[in-house]
A protein has these predicted regions:
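Cys-nucleophile CN-hydrolase/nitrilase-fold catalytic domain and related Cys-dependent amidase chemistry
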Residues: 24-101, 105, 171-188
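Active-site catalytic loop in hydrolytic enzyme cores
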Residues: 58, 87-160, 176-179, 183, ...
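Extreme N-terminal starter segment of soluble prokaryotic enzymes
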Residues: 1-6
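Residue-level detector of high-confidence beta-strand sites
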Residues: 95, 107-109, 167, 227-229, ...
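Short beta-strand scaffold segments in enzyme catalytic cores
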Residues: 82-84, 95-98, 129, 194, ...
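CN hydrolase (nitrilase-like) catalytic-core segments centered on the catalytic cysteine
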Residues: 64-79, 149-234
C-alpha cells in the first residue's frame, strides 16, 4: 500500500520561482509517496512564441524548478512527477521530470502536442516511458495532458509494467480528460493520478485558455478515489493498493494483457 497525491495549482505566467514556491507549499499540506504536479507548472501555459518558450525553459542540470523539487523530495522522502518546460540542445520540450528522493530518474517529453503547443515546442521522439521507484516498489508511467486522447499510450505503459499512470495536465476541454482517464485506468487495470491546473491565461488578441481543474485519482475499478473542485488550489492524497493494479484479469478467463490480439491492431 502506498499513497498518491495530486497538486492542483494556479501558476502565474512567467513567474517561475514564485510558481514553484507556491506549488511546493501546496504539496506540503499532505503526506504522500508520489506527488503529481500539473503540466508546465513552473512557467504557465500560453507562450506567445517559440523564442519566449525557450527563454523560460530550463535544463535539468541547472534548473531552478528541478533543484527546488529535489529539495522537496529529499525532505519528504518521496517522488515527484512534475510538468515543466525543458530546454536541451537548443530546443524546448513540454516535459515531465521524475525525481525520487533527490535523484532525477529521467524525463518524459510529451508525444502528442496540443493545438498551439506545436508552435512552441519541438516534437518528441522519447516514446512512452515507465520509471521504477525503488523506495516504494512501484512502477509508474507518465502521460502529459492531451496524451489521454490516445489509448495506445496508456496501453503501452501498462504493457511495460506501469501500475500508476501519472498525468500532469493543463486540461481545457471541460470534463473530457478526466472522464477519459477513468476509462484508461479501467481498461488497463491501473491507478491514474491527474493533476490539473486552474485559472485562465489570455496573452493574445484571440486566444484565451481556461483550465478546468477537477484533478483526480482513480482506481483500476473505474472509481474516483479523491477529486478537487474546478476552482481552488489544493493537494489531496489517498492510499493506493498496488495489488489491484497487478491483477490484470477482467474475468477468471481473461487477462487484459495476454488476451491482446496485437497482430491485428
Amino acid at each position: 500500500m502506498i499513497r498518491g497525491a495530486f497538486v492542483q495549482t494556479r501558476p502565474i505566467f512567467g513567474e517561475v520561482e514564485k510558481n514553484i514556491e507556491n506549488a511546493v507549499k501546496i504539496a506540503s499540506q499532505v503526506n504522500s509517496d508520489i506527488y503529481v504536479f500539473p503540466e508546465l507548472c513552473n512557467t504557465g501555459y500560453a507562450f506567445r512564441s517559440r523564442k519566449e518558450c525557450f527563454s523560460l525553459a530550463e535544463s535539468l542540470d541547472h534548473g531552478r524548478s528541478v533543484e527546488k523539487f529535489q529539495e522537496f523530495t529529499e525532505k519528504k522522502k518521496c517522488t515527484i512527477v512534475a510538468g515543466l518546460a525543458e530546454k536541451d540542445r537548443g530546443r524546448a520540450y513540454n516535459s515531465s521530470v521524475v525525481i525520487e528522493r533527490g535523484r532525477i530518474l529521467g524525463t518524459y517529453r510529451k508525444m502528442h502536442l496540443f493545438y498551439r503547443e506545436k508552435l512552441w515546442f519541438s516534437k518528441s521522439y522519447s516514446g512512452f516511458k515507465t520509471f521504477y521507484l525503488d523506495s516504494i516498489d512501484c512502477r509508474i508511467g507518465v502521460l502529459i495532458c492531451f496524451d489521454w486522447m490516445f489509448p495506445e499510450a496508456s496501453r503501452k505503459l501498462a504493457m511495460n509494467g506501469a501500475e500508476v499512470l501519472c498525468h500532469p495536465s493543463d486540461l481545457v476541454l471541460p470534463g473530457k480528460g478526466q472522464t477519459g482517464m477513468l476509462v484508461r485506468a479501467f481498461e488497463n487495470h491501473v491507478f491514474a493520478i491527474t493533476a490539473n491546473r486552474i485559472g485562465y491565461e489570455n496573452r493574445g488578441p484571440k486566444e484565451k485558455f481556461r483550465f478546468t481543474g477537477y484533478s483526480q485519482i482513480v482506481s483500476p475499478k473505474m472509481k474516483k478515489l479523491v477529486t478537487a473542485e474546478r476552482n481552488g488550489v489544493v493537494a489531496k492524497a489517498t492510499r493506493l493498493d498496488l495489488e489491484l493494479a497487478r491483477k490484470k484479469f477482467a474475468t477468471s478467463a481473461n487477462n487484459i494483457i495476454e488476451d491482446m490480439r496485437a497482430d491485428f491492431y
